[in-house]
């Protein structure tokens, strides 16, 4: 059975094709190009199931799916999950965070697991070795930090993260902003990981999201980078509903 998993984020949309439960291929496009890519996939692949999770504004895309006449499943607050959810306000839990924990449960059952999703925001989500989801944290993402400095000041430029090595001490405004955002976020992530390690033994750390690969080589803590962690969770949900 071929399943298409769609992660509709705030700026990008990620597609993953699963065959027999295994991820065959994945790709990511800007939200404005999602309809075109879906139409191309539908022409090339015989889709049996489409599962969809949206954290961004997906109204136009949902309308597009309905016009294509293809049935699909939408993950929402009421979608059942295979783990114990101890979040105090489950109705406000981001759908991306909810799905990420499905993958954590399936792949690391019985293990203390921290999933860090570095996207528009950086989210930290934790499940204990009893497979209970406790919650986590939400912080501004890499690009949001640059945009915030530009938006809330009169003269700071609107920058993007540099792929070059970032010095600790910025010798000009450009490099000072790069250091503040990139080194600051790295220190924040490493610091939170260290605090989790103090409280939970044998901690498995997963890093995913659009900026996950950018950050993975810069962190001092050992992490497992998996850019498809959320797509896997969507496919696991399809399998879970069949059982």
Regions found by a protein language model. Give the residues of each.
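Nucleotide/phosphate-binding catalytic cleft detector across ATP-hydrolyzing
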Residues: 1-8, 12, 16, 22-113, ...
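Catalytic metal- and UDP-sugar-binding loop of GT-A-like glycosyltransferases, i.e.
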Residues: 116
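Amphipathic coiled-coil signal-relay and dimerization helices
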Residues: 125-126
């Amino acid at each position: 059975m071929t399943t298409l998993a769609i992660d509709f984020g705030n700026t990008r949309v990620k597609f993953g094709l699963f065959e027999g439960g295994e991820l065959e291929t994945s790709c990511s496009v800007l939200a404005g190009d999602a309809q075109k890519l879906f139409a191309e996939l539908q022409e090339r692949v015989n889709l049996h199931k489409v599962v969809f999770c949206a954290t961004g504004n997906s109204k136009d895309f949902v309308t597009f799916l309905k016009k294509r006449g293809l049935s699909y499943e939408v993950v929402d607050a009421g979608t059942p999950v295979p783990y114990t959810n101890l979040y105090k306000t489950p109705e406000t839990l981001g759908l991306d965070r909810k799905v990420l924990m499905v993958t954590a449960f399936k792949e690391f059952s019985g293990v203390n697991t921290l999933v860090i999703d570095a996207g528009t925001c950086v989210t930290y989500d934790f499940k204990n070795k009893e497979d209970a989801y406790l919650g986590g944290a939400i912080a501004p993402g890499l690009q949001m930090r640059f945009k915030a400095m530009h938006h809330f000041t009169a003269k700071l430029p609107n920058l993007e993260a540099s792929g070059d090595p970032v010095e600790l001490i910025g010798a000009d405004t450009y490099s000072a902003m790069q250091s503040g955002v990139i080194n600051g976020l790295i220190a924040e992530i490493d610091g939170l990981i260290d605090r989790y390690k103090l409280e939970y033994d044998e901690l498995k750390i997963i890093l995913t999201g659009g900026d996950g690969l950018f950050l993975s080589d810069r962190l001092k803590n050992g992490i497992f980078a998996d850019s498809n962690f959320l797509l896997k969770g969507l496919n696991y949900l399809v399998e879970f509903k069949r059982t």
